[in-house]
Amino acid sequence: MLDLVVIGHVSIDTLIFPDGRRVTMPGGAAAGVATSAALAGAKVGLVTKIGTDFPKEWLQALSSVLDISGVQILPGKTIHIQMIYHEDGSVDAPVEMGVAQKMGEIPIPEEYLDAKVFHISPIPPEEQLKLLNRLKGKRVTVDFNPTYKEEYIKRRDLLREIVSRVEIVFPNEREALMITGAEDVKDAARILHGWGAKLVVITRGEKGVLVYDGSFREFPALPIKPEEIVDPTGGGDAFAGGFLAGYSRGRPLEECVRLGLERAREVLKKWGDWSITV
């Protein structure tokens, strides 16, 4: 039996720097969560769609730490994200979706259905709801992404429906405020809990983690030297993966948070969203 099944995107990411340098690497929130959870000791399955352009060595790297029976390889291109860094520090991130459409209808292997916990990584909210309808009676957690900011604001009723049907939500501080419309992070946590989430886990970067289940608990970030931070983009996914590795195996909350913080610290020291090196 799997401890955790992660559903969402795996991508090909190209970083484009102001001096013209281009670096291509594997990405995708689902792979970030899944690889982190696997390295934290969980038995993990991944459900995603990739195209025939996805490098075989990347797929082999995934298969070395988790089950890839749920990875669909389809004619066409894998979702491709460009991270264009500008000299003023701003970043543009155009996305080509490729075969990564209609994720709410993606086949889930029968042997995955008895997994202890399912995690839905950021996909359009209507697709998240389709998956929740298919996973009725299962223990489900969910994550969000500011890419869907307009949909979140326009469809707050849809978000409430999603949150009401999951055990845990994993927004970062910015996402929590955006989703709820609150101006204070603790108010945002109360709102998300009021919508029905049993546990609200808000990552706050160097300020650590805020957890709310009717009462607040705050956990400091683990120390890391500024010069050790290579790429901050994968920290949230790595945290969620580590946390879920503990949660899916019945570990105490404090241990789940510690596992998440440890995995986040490690992924900050390397480029990319994955916790494994390819």
Curated annotation (Swiss-Prot):
Keywords (alphabetical) are:
ATP-binding, Kinase, Magnesium, Nucleotide-binding, Transferase
Q: Which InterPro entries match?
A: Carboh/pur_kinase_PfkB_CS (IPR002173), PfkB_Carbo_kinase (IPR050306), PfkB_dom (IPR011611), Ribo/fructo_kinase (IPR002139), Ribokinase-like (IPR029056)
The cofactors it requires, by name, are: Mg(2+)
Q: Which reaction does it catalyse?
A: cytidine + ATP = CMP + ADP + H(+)
Name the Enzyme Commission number(s) assigned to this protein: 2.7.1.213
Task: List the GO biological process terms.
Answer: fructose metabolic process
Q: What is this protein called?
A: Cytidine kinase
What Gene Ontology molecular-function terms does this entry list? ATP binding; cytidine kinase activity; fructokinase activity
* SUPFAM superfamilies (alphabetical): Ribokinase-like (SSF53613)
Classification via Gene3D superfamilies: 3.40.1190.20
What's noted on cofactor binding? Mg(2+) is the preferred cation, followed by Mn(2+) and Co(2+).
So which domain of life are we looking at? Archaea
Binding-site residues for ATP, renumbered to this chain: 203-208
